[in-house]
A protein has these predicted regions:
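Terminal peptide-recognition signature
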Residues: 26, 141, 216
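Active-site nucleophilic cysteine motif
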Residues: 137-141, 170-185
Length: 316
């Protein structure tokens, strides 16, 4: 039976803006239930003028949107919900793979954030040219990423996930390492995307403000989406001071497996527009709260300056 973790998550966001401003907006990732997580008892509180939950067309990701249209002091919003997350193990790959469904082929596309040409293509071909099945190619890409990237604890937030930089630098945090996996996988003909989420505390009560996490998943026809978290392998290796040999159990586990201490907030989507559409250009990725004041975005990458947030977890 799959292991699970349950608790209450309380996300509080405050926005520093001029008291007389009439144009302050916030978008917060809004989690939903799926086969490995149950989200319930959602409550929204704050001194905003109005709010709503909106879906983004391309990815289907949801956002809690709120705005302040009258002069206000101390703008704040709190999203509280109950979550139960289950461990996911998907390692029973089919002996024969069918064709990639049409609706999944978009996860093979090259984008400005997820390039599949140049150095990325070169690496993809070099490590998968003797592999036939998608699951085998994905494993080869995963192994390469684990062996050829390192976690940089000084990287801000979860990193920017800029593959053109990371394919040379090969160091960063979870968005960086996961984006490298997605790029190389796509270049090798493996449908892949990022998963943007939040860790659940392991203690009865825990501050999880620094708990945002990005991992990846790939698609095997006839089997579905499969998790792969090379970024967590590299984090564990850094924290526990493990070399590749000492990390073999973790390397094996995180290909096709993720533990119960996380929920997904959003999937895919890089350089896209939220709903309602933000004013200050496309957003790199949607995992942290995003805010605009008078049409200009506040620093959102775990900045904790004008846009501040706190995440508290309380176990059930």
């Amino acid at each position: 039976m799959a292991k699970d973790r349950s608790g209450q998550i309380e996300l509080t966001v405050t926005i520093a803006a001029p008291d007389d401003s009439k144009d302050v907006k916030i978008w917060i990732p809004y989690p939903v239930s799926n086969n490995v997580q149950d989200i319930s008892n959602i409550r929204i509180n704050g001194n905003f003028s109005q709010s709503g939950v909106y879906g983004e067309k391309e990815t289907g990701n949801l956002a809690l949107y709120a705005e302040w249209t009258t002069p206000t002091k101390d703008r704040a919003i709190t999203l509280t919900f109950n979550a139960t997350a289950r461990e996911l193990i998907k390692k029973e790959f089919p002996a024969v793979e069918s064709n990639i469904p049409v609706e999944i082929k978009e996860y093979l596309k090259s984008t400005i954030f997820i390039p599949t040409d140049g150095k990325v293509k070169e690496i993809a071909l070099s490590i998968t040219n003797d592999k036939q099945k998608i699951s085998e190619k994905a494993r080869a890409v995963y192994q390469w990423v684990v062996e050829n990237t390192v976690r940089d604890p000084d990287t801000k937030g979860c990193g920017t996930g800029e593959v053109d930089i990371q394919i040379v630098k090969r160091s960063g945090k979870c968005a960086d390492i996961s984006s490298v996996f997605v790029s190389i996988a796509r270049a090798a003909g493996v449908p892949a995307r990022e998963v943007f989420g939040l860790r659940l505390g392991k203690k009865d009560e825990e501050d999880m403000t620094g708990g945002h996490h990005c991992w990846s998943e790939f698609y095997v026809p006839g089997y579905g989406w499969v998790p792969a978290d090379a970024a967590d392998v590299r984090k564990i290796m850094l924290v526990d001071k493990l070399d590749l040999k000492g990390a073999q159990d973790k390397i094996g586990y995180y290909f096709g497996g993720v533990e119960q201490y996380r929920i997904a907030l959003a999937r895919g989507g890089r350089g896209y527009y939220l709903s309602p559409r933000q004013n200050d250009g496309p957003l790199n990725y949607f995992m942290y709260p995003y805010s605009e004041v008078n049409g200009k975005s506040l620093e959102w990458l775990a900045a904790q300056t004008d846009l501040k947030y706190k995440v508290m977890f309380k176990a059930h």
